[in-house]
Design a protein with these regions (language model features):
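N-terminal transmembrane-helix/juxtamembrane module of multi-pass inner/ER membrane proteins
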Residues: 1-63, 101-113
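Interfacial segments of alpha-helical transmembrane regions
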Residues: 3-12, 69-93
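Aromatic-anchored segments of alpha-helical transmembrane domains
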Residues: 16-20, 91-98, 159-168
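Alpha-helical membrane-inserting segments
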Residues: 17, 21, 49, 95, ...
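Short juxtamembrane and helix-loop transition motifs at transmembrane-helix boundaries
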Residues: 44-56, 88, 92, 112-117, ...
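Hydrophobic alpha-helical transmembrane segments
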Residues: 57-77, 132-134, 140
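Membrane-embedded catalytic cores of phosphoryl/pyrophosphoryl-handling enzymes
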Residues: 69, 112-225
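Hydrophobic alpha-helical transmembrane segments of integral membrane proteins
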Residues: 83-113
């Protein structure tokens, strides 16, 4: 069932991404971008909301991600969970650079609230957020036994991903199609990464919290008793 769901997600994400890329490369105007501009840029922007969106956008910056990696290592003794998340992050960054160089889509002009450089498609922040926090959600789903903690963490990670994507549109540094494409690419990537690469770090059925944990040695008194 898990493999079937993974396949469906990957295929749907691939179809959406290919459609978006086709339209962008053909120079066609996408209605989604116009709708998102009207909704997010025209109607949502408020002086008090702008610093909030800037802070949300920073959840995909290196300093925050490094802190998150340290947290993964702290809460999951043994380095493999943190290394797993770190390798995922590095490979996604490389993939984003490659895709941007292929598409060469300029960033939006005229309504940016912050300065950004580089190409626009797909959104790097959106790709990073989906790949990194998405993998953390996957880890929690597979290895956390407490249902409340599991659903709380997964809801939190999902909210972060959506909020980061929305913040990039709000700040005027990406089109909605950049964000959607970034999400789709990372969903495809996570389907591959969790199937092929994650087992190298976290074998199926292994609790990350138990990785490299030494077995308890009973005391002489307990053996005598």
């Amino acid at each position: 069932v898990r493999d079937n769901l993974r396949t469906i997600i990957v295929v749907v994400a691939a179809l959406i991404f290919m459609r978006l890329a086709q339209e962008i490369l053909a120079g066609e105007a996408v209605k989604l971008d116009s709708w998102a501009y009207e909704l997010v840029v025209v109607y949502m922007r408020r002086p008090w909301l702008t610093p909030v969106m800037q802070s949300i956008s920073e959840l995909a910056l290196p300093v925050v991600l490094i802190v998150m990696l340290l947290a993964v290592e702290a809460f999951a003794p043994g380095r493999r969970p943190a290394i797993c998340a770190g390798v995922n992050l590095v490979l996604v960054l490389v993939l984003n650079v490659v895709l941007k160089q292929i598409v060469h889509r300029p960033r939006p002009e005229g309504f940016r609230l912050i300065a950004e450089t580089g190409y626009s498609f797909p959104s790097g922040h959106s790709m990073i957020a989906m790949a990194f926090y998405g993998l953390l959600a996957w880890m929690v789903w597979h290895y956390e036994r407490d249902r409340f903690v599991k659903y709380l963490c997964m809801s939190g990670f999902t909210l972060v991903v959506v909020a980061v994507g929305l913040s990039r549109i709000y700040l005027g540094v990406h089109y909605a199609t950049d964000v959607l494409a970034g999400f789709c690419v990372s969903l495809m990537w996570l389907g591959l990464y969790t199937k092929i690469f994650v087992p190298l770090f976290l074998p199926d059925g292994t609790d990350p919290q138990a990785v490299d944990r030494k077995p308890e040695v009973s005391s002489p008194s307990s053996r005598a008793g």
